[in-house]
Amino acid sequence: MLALINRLLDWFKSLFWKEEMELTLVGLQYSGKTTFVNVIASGQFSEDMIPTVGFNMRKVTKGNVTIKIWDIGGQPRFRSMWERYCRGVNAIVYMVDAADREKVEASRNELHNLLDKPQLQGIPVLVLGNKRDLPNALDEKQLIEKMNLAAIQDREICCYSISCKEKDNIDITLQWLIQHSKSRRS
């Protein structure tokens, strides 16, 4: 019953008050970026994802907020595009495969290199440690440490441990994104 009331309230609010936000989703290949977009857009998880070549753009509406998501490929040849697609967005979402400990250092280096770009200063960042359902996945505390997130001082930074497969913490991730729909663009 409460869910029905919340849906009606969201629908009613959407008639009078709409927010739009734009975000860029980046991270190393196979971290789960496209899967994350599919889960928040449709609630569907699929094991059969094809790596993103270049970029994809998708609009997702949650309540009264329309989120324009730029999903950028994570292979080395596409990483030079990250900065271009991160300029002027409300938030940057950085996806990490929390179960692939061998790639965490490379992921940390790519994140810090990206955030060192002057055009991206001040844009809030949400770091998502995906695949928490797998054995030996880093938890939030370990991810914060291994990704050296405490060193990032020029912007708001948040970190959640999620599982797209199990849909763990997708709700709080969406809450964070919706909350930042009012963030100023740089």
Curated annotation (Swiss-Prot):
Molecular functions (GO terms): GTP binding; GTPase activity
CC per GO annotation: axon cytoplasm; early endosome membrane; late endosome membrane; lysosomal membrane; lysosome; spindle
Residues reported to bind GTP: 29-35, 71-75, 130-133
Name of this protein: ADP-ribosylation factor-like protein 8B-A
Gene: arl8ba
InterPro entries: Arl8a/8b, P-loop_NTPase, Small_GTP-bd, Small_GTPase_ARF/SAR
NCBIfam families: small_GTP
GO biological process, one term: late endosome to lysosome transport
UniProt keyword DNA damage present: no
Lineage: Eukaryota, Metazoa, Chordata, Craniata, Vertebrata
Membrane-inserted regions that do not cross the membrane: 1-19
Role of this protein: Small GTPase which cycles between active GTP-bound and inactive GDP-bound states. In its active state, binds to a variety of effector proteins playing a key role in the regulation of lysosomal positioning which is important for nutrient sensing, natural killer cell-mediated cytotoxicity and antigen presentation. Along with its effectors, orchestrates lysosomal transport and fusion.
UniProt entry tagged with the keyword GTP-binding: yes
The entry's keywords: Cell cycle, Cell division, Chromosome partition, Cytoplasm, Cytoskeleton, Endosome, GTP-binding, Lysosome, Membrane, Mitosis, Nucleotide-binding
